[in-house]
Swiss-Prot record:
Positions of heme b b562 binding: H83, H182
Cofactor(s) annotated in UniProt: heme b
Recorded GO CC terms: mitochondrial inner membrane; respiratory chain complex III
Binding-site list for a ubiquinone: H201
Descriptive protein name: Cytochrome b
The keyword DNA damage is assigned to this record: no
Length: 379
């Protein structure tokens, strides 16, 4: 068996990636989230495939086809809620994975980090299009509001929006193309994940201390396969609790009302995992400025390797940077909360302050604090 996995062309790739992979001996549970994201992606593709067998991408039947899945298809309710709540867990793991990368300086693996940012954008696009498919009130109005943001682009904006819609409003053509993209994108994500891993295995994993670990590495299997298994069990437990006890906890009640272009919901808001970016978008009164801030809220991650001014890679031994990091995390929680609130005071002011603080910490305070820490260490 050992000889086969080391000699067979296909088994050799798997062996070098998941079995005999030299891994730092001190990586903590924060490194579990990569494998958990792989599990989430697998769950989403599997459940999505079964949903696609029964779903009809047509404005007249989309809503009732989802109802049919929940009521008439064998375990259809389970598949549907696993898919919906699986997306939420996917984003929880994704944000934690990025947060861990920021904390321990993993952004210094520039190629891996940049592919990760492309992956984040792709996953967000996939999730957005998936949210439109049930064709409830929030699906329709969410699609209308978010796609309409492109009209802020000078000169080509209006034409671009109508091109995406396939008409003069969100309608049958929009739903059909969103379903097509929502179906194909997870496979593109899978390909990008392979590239992400390819670049990661070129450099090897980072570790909590941030110092090179060539002198102390252990094989991935059995040590980290067992460690990852614990994370897998906990994730599946969380998903089971969500799906079986509170399946609609993270959803919007408005989405149980069929889409009606003549009736606007009082508060249009996306799913919880987009609320931080939505709050940043709303905090700027100008439409084009808001769209620019929305894109920059994610794209700012690409600047992290350029703004790493610290002599130490990880934040493990940098208490000032740690304080700033946790303020940033708290700020993101505040932005998420604000994104779900109506546009009125004091929420407008809180949102604007939190948005300013978000960019201020990442673009200014973190690099300056790192320079200060270098001085304190006489580096």
């Amino acid at each position: 068996m050992t000889i086969m996995r080391k000699q067979h062309p296909l088994a050799k790739i798997i062996n070098h990636s998941f079995i005999d992979l030299p891994t730092p001996s001190n990586i903590s549970s924060w490194w579990n989230f990569g494998s958990l994201l792989g599990l989430c992606l697998t769950i989403q593709i599997a459940t999505g495939l079964f949903l696609a067998m029964h779903y009809t991408p047509d404005t007249t039947t989309a809503f009732s086809s989802v109802t049919h899945i929940c009521r008439d298809v064998n375990y259809g309710w389970l598949i549907r809620y696993m898919h919906a709540n699986g997306a939420s867990l996917f984003f929880m793991c994704l944000f934690t994975h990025i947060g861990r990368g920021l904390y321990y300086g993993s952004h210094n693996f520039v190629e891996t980090w940049n592919i990760g940012i492309i992956l984040l954008f792709t996953v967000m696009a996939t999730a957005f299009m998936g949210y439109v498919l049930p064709w409830g009130q929030m699906s329709f109005w969410g699609a209308t509001v978010i796609t309409n943001l492109l009209s802020a682009i000078p000169y080509i904006g209006t034409s671009l929006v109508e091109w995406i819609w396939g008409g003069f409003s969100v309608d049958k053509a929009t739903l059909t193309r969103f379903f097509a993209f929502h179906f194909i994108l997870p496979f593109i994500i899978t390909a990008l994940v392979m590239v992400h891993l390819l670049f990661l295995h070129e450099t090897g994993s980072n570790n909590p201390s941030g110092i090179p670990s060539e002198a102390d590495k252990i094989p991935f299997h059995p040590y980290y396969t067992i460690k990852d298994l614990l994370g897998v069990i906990l994730l599946l437990l969380m998903l089971s609790i969500l799906v079986l006890f509170t399946p609609d906890l993270l959803g919007d009640p408005d989405n149980y009302t069929p889409a009606n272009p003549l009736n606007t919901p009082p508060h249009i808001k996306p799913e919880w995992y987009f609320l931080f970016a939505y709050a940043i978008l709303r905090s700027i009164p100008n439409k084009l400025g808001g769209v620019a801030a929305l894109i920059m809220s994610i794209l700012v991650l690409a600047l992290m390797p350029l703004m790493h001014t610290a002599k130490q890679r990880s934040m493990m031994f940098r208490p000032l940077s740690q304080c700033l990091y946790w303020i940033l995390v708290a700020d993101l929680f505040i932005l998420t909360w604000i994104g779900g609130q109506p546009v009125e005071n004091p929420f407008i002011t809180i949102g604007q302050t939190a948005s300013l603080l978000y960019f201020l910490i990442i673009l200014t305070l973190m690099p300056l604090t790192s320079i200060l820490e270098n001085k304190m260490l006489k580096w």
